[in-house]
Amino acid sequence: AAASLAATERWLASAHFAHTKPILTPRFVPSCSDALLQGLGELAARRGLPVQSHLSENLGEIALVQSLCPQTDFYAEAYDRCGLLSQPCIMAHCVHCPPEEQDLLQARGVFIAHSPLSNSNLSSGVAPVSAYLARGLRVGLGSDLAAGETENLFRVMAEAIRASKLRWRLLDDTTAPLTVAQA
C-alpha cells in the first residue's frame, strides 16, 4: 500500500493538469488492501480529488466483499469507512444495491455510472435504474469498454432502455421502464 500511495503522490506532483483532472481509481475492494483504500481516501480528501470505482456489480463480487469486510453491512460501507464516498464519487454498475446502500449513496451524493452493455455481457444483472431515478439517485451512462463493446453513448442509451424494459417485464413490474428523456 505504501509503495502504491507514494507512486501516486509522485505522479500527481509531477503531472500538469491544464486540461484534465486526475481521478483516483481503486479497481474495486477485493483488489485493494484496507491500508491502500484508507490511504486513497486520505489522499482524495487532502487533494480534493474525485474517486471512481465499481460497486455491487454482481452477486459473486458482493459475497466476496462481505467475506473480506465482515464488519460492513453492505458493499458501499467498505468504501465509506475509508472516506472514498466523501469526495465527488462515481460508482460504476450498482446492479444489486440494497435499500440501505442506496440510502448511503444518496446521502453522499454518489453518481452511479450505469453500464448496461457491460452488465449484459458479463451477465451481472439488470440495474434498477428507474427505481434509482425515482428515489433521487444521480445516474449517468457509462460505456465500460473493458466489458462493453462501444463508446457510442447513443447505443448505450438504447441498451439502457432495452434493459429497463426487460427488468420491468421479467423482474419488477412496479417501476416503469426508462424513457428516452430519462436515458
What are these regions (language model features)?
Residues 59-72, 101-106, 123-132, 149-165, ...:
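Histidine/acidic-residue-rich catalytic or RNA/ligand-binding cores of hydrolases
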Residues 81-88, 130-183:
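His/Asp/Glu-enriched, well-ordered alpha-helical/loop segment
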Residues 1-95, 100:
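Metal-coordinating catalytic core of metallo-dependent amide/deamination hydrolases
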Residues 24, 54, 91, 105, ...:
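Divalent metal-coordination and catalytic microenvironments
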Residues 41-50, 84-87, 104-113, 134-139, ...:
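Glycine-enriched alpha-helix->loop->beta-strand junction motifs that scaffold or abut catalytic
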Residues 57, 116-120, 145-147:
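Short, acidic/turn-prone active-site loops that include or flank metal/cofactor-
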Residues 27, 94, 115-117, 142-144:
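Short strand-loop junctions, especially beta-strand C-caps/beta-turns
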